[in-house]
Amino acid sequence: MRIPCLLRPLLGWFFGLCILFSALFGNYIITLFLGLPILGRHKQWRNLMDRAISYWMTIPMGLLEFLMGVRIRVSGDEIEFGSPAMIVMNHRTRLDWMYMWCALYQINPWLITSNKISLKAQLKKLPGAGFGMAAAQFVFLERNAEVDKRSFDDAIDYFKNIDKKYQILLFPEGTDKSEWTTLKSREFAKKNGLRHLDYVLYPRTTGFLHLLNKMREQEYVEYIYDITIAYPYNIVQSEIDLVLKGASPREVHFHIRKIPISQVPLNEQDASRWLTDRWTIKEQLLHDFYSEEQPINRQFPVERGDGVWRSWKEPRRHFYVKLTSLMFWTLVISFCSYHIFFVRTLQLGFLYFFVISFYLSWRYGGIDKYIIFKWQESRKSLQKSPSSSSI
């Protein structure tokens, strides 16, 4: 359904406000359960957060598809739920990770409960959503090699110890593809005697290699999923365009290749070259994709045995889950927005959330860092006790 241009900014503002208010209410609920990690109940905390926050994720997914008219097409290999893995993907826009939720939902709705994303640390400061993503234990990167390595190490140790099998999304390019980053990538290619890439940026291998080595060390990786994202009609670069202008891509396509970890070289230099080679393949794939003049005909090639998932042909139960979730959160937003002015209990509840949120940010660097801190404390106390087990 094509939406008139005059209505687009209104839809964008509505989208942004729904995300903000639903996230604030959800964050208040999250803080009510902080007693679990305090008491050392880390598995129960993680199970609760994974399910609760993935239920909230159906709001942006539903709004993108039902309100903004975004269509999702996924082709290639299926991502296995219940197997720890790394996902590497090109970073075309600042919003790729949000469309990724829609893609995972099409393959298997449970995948949105087991997907963890590495993101720029600035996104933790997003009003409402930032706190929720931190509670989901996404990995926030500071662009400081030593700090980021420690963040990866803590995350993998934590996930392994509580026996949760996640698929961790990494953007090896380190940033989205803009005019400025394309220029920097071109300078890098020229300096290192490499050919210029038109559709992707050259991947930065330091973070990839460290995460790969850590996951291998902990026996926490079975596959690497190489995902290519493309926009056949129009590209919307940032959240500013989405919220303030109401701009959204008409379709987003994903192509997945599943690679057993045994096929990835053990030597760091060879693994670095392997990743660069994957990006060269990705460049050719995107070149062929965009070489098709008619956007309606732009699709990734499907080989024998590949799956194809389309949001406009999804199973009816998947559709109704998103629809009922969207209706539920719309009622929650309406109820809270009205009663926050009159109900003292609700006012005190939100005051409690803001105080807790500020304290966790000031004292620990965020709820994600607090959870890691409490988990490490629990491990130390168990190691001192006569009998210890995983938490």
Curated annotation (Swiss-Prot):
Q: Where are the transmembrane segments?
A: 10-30, 52-72, 97-119, 323-343, 347-367
User: Which Gene Ontology molecular-function terms are recorded?
Assistant: acyltransferase activity
Instruction: Enumerate the Pfam families for this protein.
Output: Acyltransf_C, Acyltransferase
**EC number assigned by the record:** 2.3.1.-
Highest taxon in the source lineage: Eukaryota
The record's listing under InterPro entries reads: Acyltransf_C, Plipid/glycerol_acylTrfase
Q: What does the protein in this record do?
A: Acyltransferase required for the fatty acid remodeling of phosphatidylinositol (1,2-diacyl-sn-glycero-3-phosphoinositol or PI). Mediates the conversion of lysophosphatidylinositol (2-acylglycerophosphatidylinositol or LPI) into PI (LPIAT activity). Has preference for saturated and mono-unsaturated fatty acids as acyl donors and sn-2-acyl lysoPI (2-acyl-sn-glycero-3-phospho-D-myo-inositol) as acyl acceptor. Contributes to the asymmetric cell division of epithelial cells. Asymmetric cell division is the fundamental mechanism by which multicellular organisms generate cell diversity.
**What is the deletion mutant like?**
Mutants showed defects in vulval morphology and in the asymmetric division of stem cell-like epithelial cells.
A single GO cellular-component term from the record reads: endoplasmic reticulum membrane
Q: What's its catalytic activity?
A: a 2-acyl-sn-glycero-3-phospho-D-myo-inositol + an acyl-CoA = a 1,2-diacyl-sn-glycero-3-phospho-(1D-myo-inositol) + CoA; a 2-acyl-sn-glycero-3-phospho-D-myo-inositol + octadecanoyl-CoA = 1-octadecanoyl-2-acyl-sn-glycero-3-phospho-1D-myo-inositol + CoA
Q: Belongs to which family?
A: Belongs to the 1-acyl-sn-glycerol-3-phosphate acyltransferase family.
Transmembrane helix: is it a keyword of this entry? yes
Q: In which pathway does it act?
A: Phospholipid metabolism; phosphatidylinositol metabolism
How is the protein disposed in the membrane?
Multi-pass membrane protein
Which locations, inside or outside the cell, does it occupy? Answer: Endoplasmic reticulum membrane
What UniProt keywords apply to this chain's record, in alphabetical order? Acyltransferase, Endoplasmic reticulum, Membrane, Transferase, Transmembrane, Transmembrane helix
Q: Name one GO biological process term.
A: phosphatidylinositol acyl-chain remodeling
Assign the protein's first listed, main location to one coarse class: endoplasmic reticulum
What name does UniProt use for this protein?
Lysophosphatidylinositol acyltransferase 10
Tissue-level expression = Expressed in seam cells, vulval epithelial cells and the major epithelial syncytium hyp7, and in several head neurons including AIY interneurons.
> Can you name the source organism?
Caenorhabditis elegans
